[in-house]
Regions:
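Catalytic-domain carbohydrate-binding cleft regions of carbohydrate-active enzymes
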Residues: 1-245
Length: 245
């Protein structure tokens, strides 16, 4: 995986500067690849990609997604050791550059326009339907095990959007997903986080302020940050977040 966007033409300098300031840097990584990427081509050649729609559905940066311009993005098969090895092969470049933490998004994974027949596909562990909920742990363990194998002196830090029983052995932190920005949503986070800790993993948190905040944009796009109602919600959510790891 590479920094190909011209906005990050000096990625190594950026990482080094963050470290010079005695801070750590995390990067968002996904479990899916577009057809023009190196991981996609290698995984496809070996039959290690699932065949269903995932995010982003469109190759155009418009909303709602333009289905007439499909992205062709596909999720990889993390149940396969070979696929996990390939994933790390490309990810290891970022590790060598000094990335400190992995924000593993879409470890659910995103499954758009869901059809029940999508679950009838085979994966490296047999029927995808029978092991679907195991998907996040296989993704997280793949990164955790590979980094530990090459770097025993540095703690592996992972933030993942989804969780399965047993995943706590990787020390991964999970958040409750893309949730609405509302008082009702904030109230729900308390029992959600408490219930999560019953799985023997206390490392859970939420999106402070919520994720979908469009209802507060009453004065135009991104105006919610100046909305007193949203500011109050954000402050209270920040107070709650202070007690979440």
């Amino acid at each position: 995986m590479e920094f190909l966007n011209e906005d990050f033409g000096r990625a190594q300098d950026m990482i080094d500067e963050v470290h010079r300031r005695n801070a750590h840097i995390s990067i968002s990584i996904w479990q899916s690849f577009g057809p023009h990427t190196k991981p996609y081509r290698e995984l496809k050649e070996k039959g290690l990609l699932f065949d269903y729609e995932t995010w982003p559905q469109s190759g155009l940066p418009t909303w709602p997604p333009r289905k007439d311009y499909p992205s062709g993005v596909r999720v990889y098969d993390p149940y396969s050791k070979e696929a996990r090895d390939i994933y790390w092969k490309y990810l290891s470049n970022l590790h060598k550059m000094g990335i400190d933490a992995w924000w593993m998004d879409s470890t659910d994974p995103d499954h758009m326009d869901f059809k029940d027949s999508d679950l009838d596909q085979n994966c490296a562990m047999g029927s995808y339907r029978s092991v679907r909920n195991l998907f996040p742990m296989m993704c997280v363990e793949g990164v955790y095990d590979h980094q530990r194998a090459v770097d025993t002196d540095k703690r592996v830090f992972i933030l993942t959007r989804s969780y399965f029983a047993g995943q706590q052995r990787t020390g991964a932190n999970t958040w409750s997903g893309d949730i609405p920005s509302s008082w009702e949503s904030l109230r729900k986070q308390v029992p959600i986080c408490l219930n999560y800790t019953l799985t023997a993993n206390p490392q859970v948190n939420t999106d402070i302020g919520g994720f979908f905040s469009n209802s507060y944009n009453t004065q135009g796009r991104q105006s919610g940050v100046r909305n007193p109602q949203y500011q109050e919600l954000y402050v209270r959510w920040m107070q709650f977040g202070a007690f979440c790891p």
